[in-house]
Amino acid sequence: VVNFGGHQVPRVIADYSGKSTITQASLFAVGYHYSVPLDKWNITDAACDYLFLGDRAIDFPVPGTLGVIYNHAVWLQHKEQERSYPFIRAEHFVKGVERSPKLNFVYACLKDITDELVQALNGDPTTVLLIDTWNKHGYAEQRRLFVELINRNCQCPVVVGRAYRNLSPGQLQLYAATDMGGLLIDSLGDGVFIAAENCGPDKMVNDTAFNILQATRTRISKTEYISCPSCGRIVRWATTTRPTTSSMACARSRRPSRWRRSPPSPGWRATTA
């Protein structure tokens, strides 16, 4: 569905529904940098794919790679806007409200998963299911929700959504990584949506979403340097250690023959080949 599911990487949805005003500068935190002199957008590697505005609206053209999600009633007023999509609750979706011909986000919790809803989702190739939970043990409930979708043969992509409030940045990172990472690492989910109220800067929340995808190896957005398990060197040390290791190798090659290991016998080579 558009860029969800299949062989696509999981998508990141940023929550801007709680902001009173949204300007070009507001998108800096989610990876979109607007250049006033050049009148163009510069996009970082950790730029979110969609922006959830809820009942809010923006009065400027968004970058070409960014989709905007409105609550259904507000979307009806902006449906002619390019790359704008509705956010529809499950009970309204089943009743057959007006939909976008390109992409529709359907909000559902475990109690909303019924045969009627799954049939409606499978019958519309433009739908993406955005799941949420109010359960204290939300991770287990959302895993159960995925089991229900699998048992009912639901074919639409699923975005894992979680809401947090009044947490420190460290707590948010730990909770979100546990709640979402455990699902993504089992290939459950085609995107993430973190709604964090009073939990830290928007940039930190956005980076947390991308770091979760990076840690689960479902979407690589930055280069990682892994040290050698033997000596502890990493790539950035290679330029300083290579001359040393090269000279050591040359010294070993100049040792007398009695210090060298004798070549393996043909029988050993045949056994290990």
Predicted feature residues:
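Catalytic alpha/beta core domains of metabolic enzymes, predominantly
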Residues: 1-4, 13, 111-273
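Active-site beta->alpha loop and helix N-cap motifs at the rims of alpha/beta catalytic domains
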Residues: 2-4, 11-140
